[in-house]
Amino acid sequence: MRALQFLLRVSPAFLLLVLCLQLEINKAEESIWKVIQMDLQMPTVAVANEEVTVKLGIQTELKECMVIKAYLRSNIQIDGPFNYRYTSCLCDDYPRTFYWDLVANRTATIAAVVDIIRELDICPEDRAVVPIKSNRYYVLHRLNVS
C-alpha cells in the first residue's frame, strides 16, 4: 500500500519531467542547420576598366566538413583572375574566404557559386559529407560600371 501511495505522489512530478523532456526533444528536432552561408562583398559601382576586388566569405553550421569549389560567373565576358576556381575543405570551425580581382568595362551581374563536391585529398583523412538536398549555392550581385 505504501508503495502505491509513493507512486501516486511522485506521479505529477514525473509527468512534469516527461513533459519538459518532450518539449526539449521537439525543440532539438526543429533545429535546422544552414549548410552554406555566403557573404559576398564587392562595390556596387565601378569605373570602366578599373580593377575591382570581390571577397566571398563562406561558412557552415554542419558539424561535418565538406569539400567545396567556389567560383564566379557573369552575364558578360570577364577575363583574368575572375575565372579562378578555389577548391577547399569547409568545416564549422574553419570558415573560408576567397578573393578575386576583376576588370569590367560594362555593367554586369556577378554570381558567386559554391558547389559541394566529392573529391579526395582535400579534407583531413578524406572525411567529408555531401548534402542530399542541394549541392549548389549562389548569391547574385550587380556591378554598375560608369
Curated annotation (Swiss-Prot):
Subunit field text: Monomer. Interacts with AZGP1.
InterPro entries found in the cross-reference section: Ig-like_fold, Ig_E-set, PIP
Protein family according to the UniProt entry: Belongs to the PIP family.
Record-linked PANTHER family: PROLACTIN-INDUCIBLE PROTEIN (PTHR15096:SF5), PROLACTIN-INDUCIBLE PROTEIN/SEMINAL VESICLE ANTIGEN (PTHR15096)
Disulfide bonds: C65-C91, C89-C123
Signal sequence interval, chain numbering: 1-28
Record-given protein name: Prolactin-inducible protein homolog
Compartments in which it is found: Secreted
GO molecular function annotation: aspartic-type endopeptidase activity; identical protein binding; IgG binding
Pfam family, one: SVA
GO cellular component, one term: extracellular space
Primary location: secreted
Glycosylation sites: N105
Alphabetical keyword list: Disulfide bond, Glycoprotein, Secreted, Signal
Organism of provenance: Oryctolagus cuniculus
GO biological process, one term: proteolysis
